[in-house]
């Protein structure tokens, strides 16, 4: 994987497989714990050297993301789980670390670990750098993730099915509620919103609001296209649209 995707790859787990190549044990390298199909178990003795080596690599990846952690690591050549998580979270935010996990949707092994890792290592919106944008005059500006700011959202995908058209949005600033009217700088139209949805697979669950950093869907926005910005009419910004690869 590293040969293909580069040194940012950071395995968070080590695995043990049986004769049929089915994974039987997953070791959480961050917390130094092992799990099998029944739950937490002892780390297998024949995995000790591999786990030690991979944990050392993970510590280096975490330390490399933060100068303070790097100094701490060089002093003792060891980092606590909390320090490792801190460094990895910084690395994930900056793109210098790409965690790799293992799991099976069929057996359920590793799924809990994946969910916990997302909570522990993936930064929330307010930790992320500001989004690039333009104002009405075409000047470059930045839009910080601010839950209390004037609303700004980007339409990143459009879905059409037997139930109609859904505009998928990511809220960069403020929040979106169904009783709002938002301005579309691309068309000059003010759009009255209606029902909002949280998409779960192909099904939409109706919700009251989409908060800063969240994604959701707006139904029946016929004049809105993928890449459009939806924003407060008194605070117009144009967020960077989707860059499509050349055919």
Q: PLM ranges: what are they?
A:
Residues 1-247:
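Structural and coupling elements of P-loop NTPases
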């Amino acid at each position: 994987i590293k040969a293909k995707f580069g040194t940012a790859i950071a395995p968070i787990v080590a695995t043990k497989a049986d004769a049929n190549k089915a994974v039987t044990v997953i070791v959480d390298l961050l917390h130094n714990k092992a799990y099998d199909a029944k739950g937490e178990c002892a780390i297998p003795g024949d995995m000790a050297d591999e786990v030690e080596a991979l944990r050392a690599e993970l510590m280096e990846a975490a330390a490399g993301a933060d100068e303070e952690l790097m100094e701490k690591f060089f002093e003792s050549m060891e980092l606590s789980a909390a320090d490792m998580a801190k460094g990895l979270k910084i690395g994930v935010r900056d793109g210098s670390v790409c965690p790799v996990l293992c799991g099976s949707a069929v057996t359920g092994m590793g799924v809990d670990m994946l969910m916990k890792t997302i909570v522990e290592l993936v930064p929330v919106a307010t930790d992320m750098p500001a989004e690039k944008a333009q104002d009405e005059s075409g000047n470059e500006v930045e839009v910080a993730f601010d839950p209390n700011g004037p609303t700004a959202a980007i339409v990143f995908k459009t879905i059409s099915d037997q139930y109609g058209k859904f505009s998928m949005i990511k809220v960069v600033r403020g929040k979106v509620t169904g009783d709002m009217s938002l301005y579309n700088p691309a068309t000059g139209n003010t759009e009255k919103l209606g029902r909002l949805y949280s998409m779960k697979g192909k099904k939409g669950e109706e919700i009251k609001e989409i908060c800063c950093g969240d994604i959701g869907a707006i139904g029946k926005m016929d004049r809105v296209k993928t890449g459009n910005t939806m924003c407060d009419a008194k605070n117009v910004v144009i967020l960077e649209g989707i860059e499509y690869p050349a055919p």
